[in-house]
Design a protein with these regions (language model features):
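Extreme N-terminal starter segment of soluble prokaryotic enzymes
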Residues: 2-6
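N-terminal strand-loop element at the rim of the active site
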Residues: 7-14, 27, 31-79
Length: 143
């Protein structure tokens, strides 16, 4: 039986963590793993590559593709609301499946979201891609 794996990352922009995630998704054994990537925003240079290789769930659509001014305003409100809302509520709203492994692929919000998972049986991993001593902004996410 395949292991169900969830990766959580804020976007698929052109950073190093996004490239590493894309490489993992492209090369992981699909006979052993069923991969889902959850992003806050559906944006970045790796979106198409990820969509070809696994399930991609995005909390918000691609802002660039919104043409209606009201939709753009709603997007901005929803974006701010996601970061202010209780992570357990956000998790419950967007993560509908049960996963064997849940991986926060960057520090910060993704880590808080995975830590808020209601699934007690999943293995949870926080994959940190920065030097936390030099990145003081990350302090608020850790004890």
């Amino acid at each position: 039986m395949k292991k169900k794996v969830l990766f959580v990352i804020e976007s698929l922009s052109g950073g190093g963590a996004e490239k590493v995630l894309t490489t993992i998704v492209k090369n992981i054994d699909k006979t052993k793993f069923d991969i889902t990537v959850l992003t806050i925003v559906k944006t970045g240079i790796y979106v198409e590559e990820i969509e070809k290789k696994c399930t991609l769930i995005s909390m918000l659509p691609e802002y660039e593709k919104l043409t209606n001014p009201i939709a753009k305003m709603k997007y901005k409100v929803d974006y701010k609301k996601i970061y202010k809302e209780d992570c357990a509520k956000i998790y419950k709203k967007y993560v509908k499946n049960v996963y064997d492994v849940e991986i926060a692929f960057v520090e910060g919000f993704a880590t808080k979201l995975v830590a808020s998972s209601w699934n007690r049986n999943s293995k949870k991993i926080a994959w940190v891609h920065v030097d936390l001593i030099r990145r003081a902004y990350a302090d608020e996410y850790f004890l």
